């Protein structure tokens, strides 16, 4: 028997992803704006995230939130929720973010890594509600500081590794989320340190897929 490790660490990031994201932020005129993403969110969580964004805007009035619901059937309802409070652009509509936009709704499929790449700070959803959280290695692979709520039971070991390395911070509620994002905006050296720690965890644990393939090759010889 051989333990190969988790293939989740073997996430490959396209070399053009970050340059494409930087170019789009420049096109938006948002290179200097604080941008944070709340990704893979669930019902009951979006309202908490928008509450956190409202609090954040009191300190950083130009902050942009990229909100990405986990399930496509919720896109319209979450869009309505956003529009009730903020100037909102739907990614699927192809409209550009401008200086008045406060929320970009990530309502497209297959773009999650690119949407992460547009951000400076990442909140991974399914964790402020008792869903168990989603994969924090996706933002870690892009050297983003990662925030999650208290419910991470789907990724207990991985979240513990990132937390112990100083790459992931957990918060309990909307107020804690707003405060965590605010601090990372105001202390960019801390944000960089968290991001670099996450990428180091990724790199230190890569190779499981190749070990698995090598093991399978030996078995079928």
Question: What does each model-found stretch correspond to?
Answer:
Residues 1-221:
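Nucleotide-activated sugar donor-binding and catalytic core shared by glycosyltransferases
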């Amino acid at each position: 028997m051989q333990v190969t490790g988790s293939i989740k660490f073997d996430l490959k990031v396209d070399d053009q992803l970050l340059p494409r994201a930087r170019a789009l932020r420049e096109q938006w005129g948002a290179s200097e704006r604080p941008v944070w993403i709340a990704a893979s969110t669930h019902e009951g969580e979006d309202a908490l995230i928008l509450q956190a964004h409202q609090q954040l805007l009191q300190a950083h009035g130009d902050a942009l939130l990229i909100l990405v619901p986990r399930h496509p059937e919720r896109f319209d309802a979450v869009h309505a929720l956003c529009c009730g409070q903020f100037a909102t652009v739907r990614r699927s509509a192809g409209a550009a973010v401008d200086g008045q936009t406060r929320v970009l709704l990530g309502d497209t499929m297959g773009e999650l890594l690119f949407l992460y790449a547009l951000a400076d700070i990442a909140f991974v959803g399914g964790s402020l509600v008792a869903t168990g959280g989603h994969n924090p290695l996706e933002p870690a692979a892009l050297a983003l500081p990662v925030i999650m709520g208290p419910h991470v039971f789907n990724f207990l070991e991985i979240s513990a590794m990132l937390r112990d390395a100083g790459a992931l911070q957990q918060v309990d509620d909307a107020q804690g989320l707003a405060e965590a994002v605010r601090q990372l905006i105001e202390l960019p050296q801390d944000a960089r340190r968290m991001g670099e720690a996450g990428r180091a965890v990724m790199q230190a644990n890569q190779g499981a897929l190749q070990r698995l393939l090598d093991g399978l090759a030996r078995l079928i010889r």
